[in-house]
Structures are given as structure tokens and as C-alpha cells.
Amino acid sequence: MASPRTRKVLKEVRVQDENNVCFECGAFNPQWVSVTYGIWICLECSGRHRGLGVHLSFVRSVTMDKWKDIELEKMKAGGNAKFREFLESQEDYDPCWSLQEKYNSRAAALFRDKVVALAEGREWSLESSPAQNWTPPQPRTLPSMVHRVSGQPQSVTASSDKAFEDWLNDDLGSYQGAQGNRYVGFGNTPPPQKKEDDFLNNAMSSLYSGWSSFTTGASRFASAAKEGATKFGSQASQKASELGHSLNENVLKPAQEKVKEGKIFDDVSSGVSQLASKVQGVGSKGWRDVTTFFSGKAEGPLDSPSEGHSYQNSGLDHFQNSNIDQSFWETFGSAEPTKTRKSPSSDSWTCADTSTERRSSDSWEVWGSASTNRNSNSDGGEGGEGTKKAVPPAVPTDDGWDNQNW
């Protein structure tokens, strides 16, 4: 790539000496130059100049190539107008020369020497130039021309020139390529020709690319699965080791210590005895519940006394500890330990024993006998004390309902 300084110098040179057109064909805005003569040429003509060889024409790009200072000085020393005027001033110049003849001539050699001298800062003169004795190289002749008759030199020369032009055109075509692109040449690679098997090659390359991507993804998946399995295995082994340690500390070690100390059999026997006692207690309680259910009686921990004895004892204690001035009904109601309730199965009132909670259908008879026992006990107590008190007459059974406050 040309530097900014190079572009600036070339821009200044372009506007001078008819350098804005191609020296060979007159095309506008040329982008290539022949540094050897300081002339500006187009892309097509630059290809033809390359065919001449670098000893006759050294071609450079204005924008794409790097430049040296000596090359920029040659561009200042030369130019399109200067080269044309110099060629026309020479005696051996022929306007009908071909490209090969023109640049292999003595006039072109003199101008090349002049450009080099001016670029190097030397003075140049036609008389002192070493190009005065320039001899153009003989053009190549075809093998068929060797057998031509020497009496036809002009035709042989014309044929050789035509053959050289054909060879030059073929060489130019090799540089430009089959596409004929205007910008194909030095610094611009021509596009490759498409072949019939390009489609197959592209398909195979796509297949290979897809397979390589698949193998890459599979390898990544396998590596990720391996890492996951390794991590899971490490965690599982860690948990198993923790569980084994806990089992060893909490179960195996205590059992082993007890076996060593001889306490394991004591613990087993105590556990069995406790279990047997629990089973025995549950069995006895169940048998007692079944017996109670079928007998219809609730059994307490101790046998309850008879009803008459209970009433007698309660009445005796009451008469000994209570005032005799109270009426019979008030004394009976306050001192009676049993509660009077109505049986749900009959209309009779029964006296419930506090110890056993039994029901009796003969409640009125028991109540009557209890009253008689209480009266007799009261008389005996009074006689022992030596004090005579009037005993109220026994109230008939049927009159008891009128005195109760229901």
C-alpha cells in the first residue's frame, strides 16, 4: 500500500506532462506506471509492459505497491510528454514500431539512461551516454524460418514479427486470464475457473465439516458426562463413608463394648423381662374387662361392703356426729353418702353405692331398713350418754314425697 507521502508526490506528477492519460492507448485516469520511463499506463497496457521484462519496463501500481525514493525521482524525471518528444527527436524512430520494437530501440535505451542520471542527480548528455552503442537484441525466429530462402529477407522479417506479436499476445493473455477482467494483473489475482466437479467437492467438504462438528460435539458431551459421573460417584462415596462412620460410632462400637464388658446379655434379659411383664399386665386387664362386660358389674380393686352394712355404718356415724334436733329427712338427706337418682329402666328411685355404683330395684326396702337401723343406733347412743331425748315417730313411706322439696 502506497504511503501518504507517495500518494502526494504521484498526485503532483499526474497533472504534469500529459500524465493523466495512458501513454500507449490514451485511456483516462491510468493507475499503473512504468518507472523505467516515468510514463503512466492503464491496466491492459501494464500487462503488455510486463511482458517486455523488468530490464525494459518496470511496472508499479499507483495505490497498491510500496515505493522507494529513487522510484519517485524517476517519475519526476520522466513523463508521457517528455518520452514522446524524445522518441520523435531521434533519427531511427518509426511511429509504426510495435511495442517490442519501440522499447528495444536505441532511442528507448537513451531515454532510460537519461531518467536514471537525472534521478540520481547527475547531468546527462547525448554524446556521453553509454547507450550510444546500444544494439537491439535479435528477435526470436521460429524454426520453420531457418529453411526459408535467403532471397526473401523482407518476408522472413515480417513473419518473425507476426510470430513475436502472437507470442506476446499469448503471454499477455496468460497474465490477464480467461475472464478478461480489466483489473486482473499484477497485484490482482484472477478468480479460479469453475470446474464441473466443484459441486461434488463442495458437497463433500460440507459433509466433512458436518462430521467434524458432530465428532467435536460428541467428544464434548462425553467429557461432560464423564465429569458428571465422576462428581456423582465422589459424592456417593462420601455419603456412604459418612453413613458407615455414623453406623460404626452409634451401633457397632457400643455393641462391641457391651460384648467386651459382658453387659449385652444383661440388657437383653432385662428387655425380655420388661416385655413379658407388659404382656402379662395387658392380658390380665383384658380378661378383667371381658369378665366385667359379661357380668354387667364394675369390679373395683377391693370388694365393696354390703348395702345394709354401708347404710348402717353411714347412719351410725351420722347419728353420733350430728345434732338430734334435726328432722329425720334433713338428717337423712345431708348424711347420706349415696346419691339418689332415677333409674332409666324403671320409675323407682334407687340409691347408688359410692364405692361400687350398684343399682338396686328394692331401693325403698333398703331405705326403710336403713331408717330402722339408724333409729336403733340413735337410741343406743342416747342411753349411753344418760340423756333422754324424744325420738320422732317414723314417718310412713308414702308421706315422704310430700316433705321433699322437689
Curated annotation (Swiss-Prot):
Residue numbers bearing the N6-acetyllysine modification: K231
GO BP: any one term: protein transport
In-chain residues carrying the UniProt-annotated modification Phosphothreonine: T135, T189, T350
Modified residues (Phosphoserine): S150, S246, S304, S343, S346, S348, S361, S363, S378
Pfam families named among the record's database cross-references: ArfGap
A GO MF label: zinc ion binding
GO CC term (a single one): Golgi membrane
Domain of life: Eukaryota
Location of the Arf-GAP domain: 7-124
Signal recorded as keyword: no
SUPFAM superfamilies (alphabetical): ArfGap/RecO-like zinc finger (SSF57863)
InterPro entries: ARFGAP/RecO, ArfGAP_dom, ArfGAP_dom_sf
Residue numbers spanned by region Disordered: 297-406
Zn-finger segments (C4-type): 22-45
Alphabetical UniProt keywords: Acetylation, Cytoplasm, ER-Golgi transport, Golgi apparatus, GTPase activation, Metal-binding, Phosphoprotein, Protein transport, Transport, Zinc, Zinc-finger
Described function: GTPase-activating protein (GAP) for the ADP ribosylation factor 1 (ARF1). Involved in membrane trafficking and /or vesicle transport. Promotes hydrolysis of the ARF1-bound GTP and thus, is required for the dissociation of coat proteins from Golgi-derived membranes and vesicles, a prerequisite for vesicle's fusion with target compartment. Probably regulates ARF1-mediated transport via its interaction with the KDELR proteins and TMED2. Overexpression induces the redistribution of the entire Golgi complex to the endoplasmic reticulum, as when ARF1 is deactivated.
Xref: PANTHER family: ADP-RIBOSYLATION FACTOR GTPASE-ACTIVATING PROTEIN 1
Comment text on domains: The region downstream of Arf-GAP domain is essential to GAP activity in vivo. This region may be required for its targeting to Golgi membranes.
Protein name as catalogued: ADP-ribosylation factor GTPase-activating protein 1
UniProt source species: Homo sapiens (Human)
